[in-house]
């Protein structure tokens, strides 16, 4: 059985149709079944990524259902010692927008309009493996995130000893 903390990898270009449907990469669907014995997953707003100044990139994060249930349990049990204001913000921005999903037989999933709007998903998008989750970005946003990451990479690699 694969390591449940390191199952999603790679970058996969895709598109979204006029009805808001996209195909989850086959590798990701297979990983859900192999590692979690469950095809269900949860889609929510990703943590915004700073692009410098007051600009932020918005995307979506997708978690296996069992991993999401653990995240939600820990957040609501306040294991992080959050203030009530922080916990309310986490609920509004991360927990409450979450939607349980299941791909159809063709691997398609409907991204809810509110999440599509949040992430600016219109046509071209990227699925990006992030070990225990995967993210969904519009092509333009992902290009900006990559540009920012390239600028930060030398310092980030040095910080972890490379």
From Swiss-Prot:
Q: Which residues form the SpoVT-AbrB domain?
A: 11-62, 98-141
* InterPro entries on file: MraZ, MraZ_C, MraZ_dom, MraZ_N, MraZ_sf, SpoVT-AbrB_dom, SpoVT-AbrB_sf
- Which Gene3D superfamilies does its entry note? Transcriptional regulator MraZ domain (3.40.1550.20)
* A Pfam short name: MraZ
| A single GO cellular-component term on record | nucleoid
Highest taxon listed in the record's lineage: Bacteria
SUPFAM superfamilies linked to this entry: AbrB/MazE/MraZ-like
Q: What is its main location?
A: cytoplasm
Q: What PROSITE patterns does this protein map onto?
A: SPOVT_ABRB (PS51740)
Tell me the GO BP annotations in alphabetical order.
negative regulation of DNA-templated transcription initiation
> Which key words are in the record?
Cytoplasm, DNA-binding, Repeat, Transcription, Transcription regulation
- Location relative to the cell: Cytoplasm, Nucleoid
Stretches of the chain forming a coiled coil according to its record? none
One Gene Ontology molecular-function label: DNA-binding transcription factor activity
Q: Which HAMAP family match?
A: MraZ
The family assignment reads:
Belongs to the MraZ family.
Q: How does it assemble?
A: Forms oligomers.
Q: Which PANTHER family match?
A: TRANSCRIPTIONAL REGULATOR MRAZ (PTHR34701:SF1)
Q: What is this protein called?
A: Transcriptional regulator MraZ
Species of provenance: Pelobacter propionicus (strain DSM 2379 / NBRC 103807 / OttBd1)
